[in-house]
């Protein structure tokens, strides 16, 4: 069973004296099959925008208490306060937030020239972070299906947070893995979503060329106390087995994979998603991925229940570097409908039409998009043979 944050056996808080941080072993957050909550997680009708109004799982309690302590200790580049938020008028339902500090104070992205670029130990990587930035290690119990030698995943604060609880999931940083999605990393990301009782805890991945700023394998996880359009957007099946769908009603259509929760279905989904991302990486196609609780594929409505986990994959134009003049840069959260805006002027003037235009500018040319879709459908078909 997952250990609560106030357990006598495990503490996820740093000792008061920072000279002791180096000597403190990284605590384990151990979880098993019964800690993965696939059903019964829904948005409250009365206060969907209030994080504190929802119950916490042991995972939520451990993450939030340890993250809050790091805020108090000043380990972030800036102190994240309540962000000004607006739902942009229109049909999409964009959630825009003003986050000036992240736009100004975040670490400059590394120079990336290829989606397949090798790991460079001389560049910044997660072996170079301060000891206090590590919250704990995710450790799966043997009762969970999947690879027997599943690597441990470090949960690390993002020192330039998008939102409350913004962390990075880093698989065994000493291995020096480049930013290429692997099954163990994806499994940890999906299971983190299932470990949380909050419907707004999301996980995502940016490839190189898809605005990953560090070429060292990591996923993002964070809380956003608002519904996003990807949770319930309708979709149409692309393969006879119904394993791959095309998400509709969004500025950038994405490939939708869906699972009801832990078990063989989840393992099959991980295999299919990684086959797709391997294809994209091998063909130098940048991509972004987003994991959220959501409705099943097909025709959905705003009232559709969040009965499982949606994994959405976008193939997109490569973008090597940050476009400083734009209201926002398009990566995993923007494609999902969450828009962290850099300046007050852009925040006050941003419209749905302008946001749609920025996102659509990252779409692949139609001929290449059709080629990618056909290739991914073929990959799904091969898997079923």
Curated annotation (Swiss-Prot):
Q: Where is the active site?
A: 218 (tele-gmp-histidine intermediate)
Q: Name one GO cellular component term.
A: cytoplasm
Q: Specify the superkingdom.
A: Eukaryota
Q: Assign the protein's first listed, main location to one coarse class.
A: cytoplasm
Q: Which GO terms describe its molecular function?
A: GDP-D-glucose phosphorylase activity; guanyl-nucleotide exchange factor activity; hydrolase activity; nucleotide binding
* Keyword Nucleotide-binding among UniProt keywords: yes
Coiled coil where? none
Documented EC number(s): 2.7.7.78
Q: Which reaction does it catalyse?
A: GDP-alpha-D-glucose + phosphate = alpha-D-glucose 1-phosphate + GDP + H(+)
What subcellular compartments does it reside in?
Answer: Cytoplasm
The UniProt entry's GO biological process terms, in alphabetical order, are: glucose metabolic process
Q: Which UniProt keywords apply?
A: Cytoplasm, Guanine-nucleotide releasing factor, Hydrolase, Nucleotide-binding, Nucleotidyltransferase, Transferase
Give the family per the record.
Answer: Belongs to the GDPGP1 family.
- What this chain does, per the record? Specific and highly efficient GDP-D-glucose phosphorylase regulating the levels of GDP-D-glucose in cells.
* Identification of the protein by name: GDP-D-glucose phosphorylase 1
Organism the protein comes from: Macaca fascicularis (Crab-eating macaque)
Q: What lineage is this protein's organism placed in?
A: Eukaryota, Metazoa, Chordata, Craniata, Vertebrata
């Amino acid at each position: 069973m997952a250990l609560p944050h106030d357990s006598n056996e495990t503490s996820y808080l740093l000792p008061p004296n920072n000279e002791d941080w180096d000597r403190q072993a990284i605590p384990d957050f151990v979880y098993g099959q019964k800690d993965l909550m696939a059903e019964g997680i829904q948005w409250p009708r009365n206060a969907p925008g209030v994080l504190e109004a929802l119950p916490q799982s042991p995972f939520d309690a451990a993450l939030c208490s340890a993250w809050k302590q790091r805020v108090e200790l000043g380990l972030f580049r800036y102190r994240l306060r309540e962000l000004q938020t607006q739902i942009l008028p229109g049909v999409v339902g964009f959630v825009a937030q003003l986050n000036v500090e992240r736009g100004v104070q975040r670490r400059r992205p590394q120079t990336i020239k290829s989606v397949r670029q090798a790991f460079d130990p001389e560049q910044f990587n997660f072996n170079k972070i301060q000891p206090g930035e590590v919250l704990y290690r995710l450790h799966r119990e043997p009762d969970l299906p999947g690879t027997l030698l599943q690597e441990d995943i470090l949960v690390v604060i993002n020192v330039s947070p998008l939102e409350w609880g913004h962390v990075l999931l880093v698989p065994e940083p000493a291995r020096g893995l480049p930013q290429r999605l692997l099954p163990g990393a994806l499994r940890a990301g999906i299971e983190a979503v299932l470990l949380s009782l909050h419907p707004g805890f999301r996980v995502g991945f940016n490839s190189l060329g898809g605005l990953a700023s560090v070429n060292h394998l990591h996923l993002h996880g964070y809380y956003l106390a608002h519904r996003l359009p990807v949770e319930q957007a309708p979709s149409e099946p692309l393969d006879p087995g119904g394993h791959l769908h095309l998400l509709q009603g969004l500025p950038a259509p994405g490939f939708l994979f869906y699972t009801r929760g832990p078990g063989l279905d989840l393992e099959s989904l991980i295999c299919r998603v990684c086959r797709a991302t391997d294809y994209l990486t091998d063909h130098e196609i940048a991509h972004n991925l987003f994991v959220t609780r959501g409705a099943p594929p097909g025709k959905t409505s705003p009232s559709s229940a969040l009965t499982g986990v949606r994994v959405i994959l976008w193939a997109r134009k490569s973008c090597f570097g940050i476009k400083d003049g734009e209201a926002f840069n398009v990566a995993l959260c923007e494609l999902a409908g969450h828009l962290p805006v850099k300046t007050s002027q852009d925040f006050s003037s941003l419209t749905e039409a302008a946001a749609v235009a920025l996102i659509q500018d990252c779409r692949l040319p139609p001929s290449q998009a059709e080629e990618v879709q056909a290739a991914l459908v073929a990959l799904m078909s091969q898997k079923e043979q």
